[in-house]
Amino acid sequence: MSSLTFFIFCLQLFIFTSTVSGISIKRCTEEENNTWEIEVGLCIQTENFRAIKTGCYKIQGPGGLLTEGNGFKIFAHDDCSKEKTQNNFILDSVNEAVYALGKYVYMEISTSNITTLNSLPQCAKRISLSISCDQVTTEMKSYVESVSFKDYDLEFVITTDISCVKHVSSSVIVRNECEKKYISTGKKIFGFNNKIDCSAVKFSEHVNYLKTCSVGKFDRKKYYEHQHNYIKKIFHHNEL
């Protein structure tokens, strides 16, 4: 083989290798890198009562949202006041599934298509979720856990009323569209036993059972005094 022939062979091999490598490289657009989603999953095991598959209701306020149904309420809000931010609460979607004849309820509270994650005020990145029992009229007997995403400066705090809840497992996922397509980063799992399966349903299978919560109407008479602080945060009320 002459030197020229060998050179041409090497050049063709280089071009072929580069082409194949180029095909295998997974690239993301700027939009995918800057579009975020947040998903909070709660597997709630009930205590001394069974949830009923009557559906749930979501009520949205500027500072948060609340859900009703199945023997408990969930209050979700950030730390912002009306004066501190013009941004609405970043979580805006609620889905629910009831398992094992009402012994387990899986709640998914989420949002997608966030393009302002890095520019959000600090108060909007401090998210609290509280599970409160309908039948308990006094202060919550609570268990508190938290998780932080330092890269995004996000913090989540979950408070559970153990008067009606036997057990809660929780997951928090923060990722952009690029991560969602190619890698499973961004997920943090926390809970009593670091398990996010619910009853006999695996985490990856919840999507097959989830139903969207209907839009409800706020009625302050449904809420006990110890729940009023959550309401004030969600609706930016100074008093009730």
Swiss-Prot record:
Gene3D superfamilies linked: 2.60.240.30
Residue ranges crossing the lipid bilayer per the database entry: none
Pfam families to which the protein is assigned, alphabetical: Pox_T4_C (PF04490), Pox_T4_N (PF04491)
Domain of life: Viruses
Family the UniProt entry places it in: Belongs to the poxviruses B9 family.
Protein name: T4 protein
Organism whose genome encodes this protein: Sheeppox virus (strain InS-1) (SPPV)
The organism's taxonomic lineage, starting at the top: Viruses, Varidnaviria, Bamfordvirae, Nucleocytoviricota, Pokkesviricetes
